[in-house]
Amino acid sequence: MSVNTNIPPILVRREGAVLVLAIHTPGKRNAISPGLSDPLTEALNAARPDADIGAVVLTGADGYFCSGGDLNVLATRRLLTPQQRRGELGGLHGLIRLLRDFPKPVVASVEGGAAGAGLSMALGCDLLVAARDATFSVAYIKVGLTPDG
């Protein structure tokens, strides 16, 4: 099975003064991999000085917020040194700090599930709005990890 690398991992749109960032990894319930934090961080950093943006909404595409780390990618990382792992996780940890400290309101709009790192991103936001079908799971222990790396 081939992977379409042309699919953007983040969908960005404007709705008036609101910047909407949607995690978009189709077929994986919006699982995240090491490079996913980069486009989110770039979009937030671009929004910071933009006076026309009053708030940010972080959500997931296709009715699911984020299932956490992509287990297929994580399995390939088991041979990394601790320093290499810290480097990869640094982007995600930096993103969560950026969400927490962002100077404009950031709202997590959660449909479906928010698990593992997806839950951490949602909790980094100023406000979390959950749909009736929303579920939340720390999930790390299920795959032998400690929370957030």
Model-based region annotation:
Residues 21, 58, 70, 121-123:
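Hydrophobic/aromatic residues within transmembrane alpha-helices
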Residues 31-34, 67, 76, 142:
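Phosphate-coordinating loops and pocket residues in cytosolic domains that bind phosphorylated ligands
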Residues 1-61, 83, 97:
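Conserved CoA-thioester-binding segment of acyl-CoA-metabolizing enzymes
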